[in-house]
């Protein structure tokens, strides 16, 4: 890796490249050009080359990228060429939906523990996992080798869930709640806010309509 400082936007694009490459692989493609990959991902070919350059040299001039090799190289560079064991805390509607989502394991993230503090939910079985009391999280993290925690609790319980995860030794947290979490410097948090995407789409539509109106005014 040429640089330890890699923009988060680059990491997100690399994840998108892997998703597209895996689709191409399933369709039987063995080689892909930077132009086709860029077009499919809605980015410039130069952006793809720049993103990949953080991790070394890829592809053959005039030939393109070998799909399987590039999938492996990106996954290896991102540390997702292995299985990461995860715990999910908060068994509401969103938590249950994530537990039933088959793509997690396919992508290398295996949710092996489900936790909640509600006695009415403890003992419930979802997708083969029994919901366990949050207070047992520390033992479960050690026994199951859990490294990543997913928080899907109500906002007023998110920090408490975070504290349980940190005390258990978890170093990576994906927070699906609206809460802004307080964590030590060595704990990494990613916030998943679905409304960011709604805002982005709404802005794009609004901007297009505004430009259409401006164009119509100029024609007059």
From Swiss-Prot:
One of its GO terms (cellular component) is cytoplasm. Residues 16-55 bind DNA. NAD(+) binds at residues 90-95. The gene is rex. Gene3D superfamilies: NAD(P)-binding Rossmann-like Domain (3.40.50.720), Winged helix-like DNA-binding domain superfamily/Winged helix DNA-binding domain (1.10.10.10). Its main location: cytoplasm. This is Redox-sensing transcriptional repressor Rex. GO terms for molecular function: DNA binding; DNA-binding transcription factor activity. Keywords: Cytoplasm, DNA-binding, NAD, Repressor, Transcription, Transcription regulation. Homodimer. NCBIfam families: PRK05472.2-1, PRK05472.2-2, PRK05472.2-3, PRK05472.2-4, PRK05472.2-5. Belongs to the transcriptional regulatory Rex family. GO terms for biological process: negative regulation of DNA-templated transcription; response to redox state. It comes from Solidesulfovibrio magneticus (strain ATCC 700980 / DSM 13731 / RS-1). It is found in: Cytoplasm. Modulates transcription in response to changes in cellular NADH/NAD(+) redox state. SMART domains: CoA_binding.
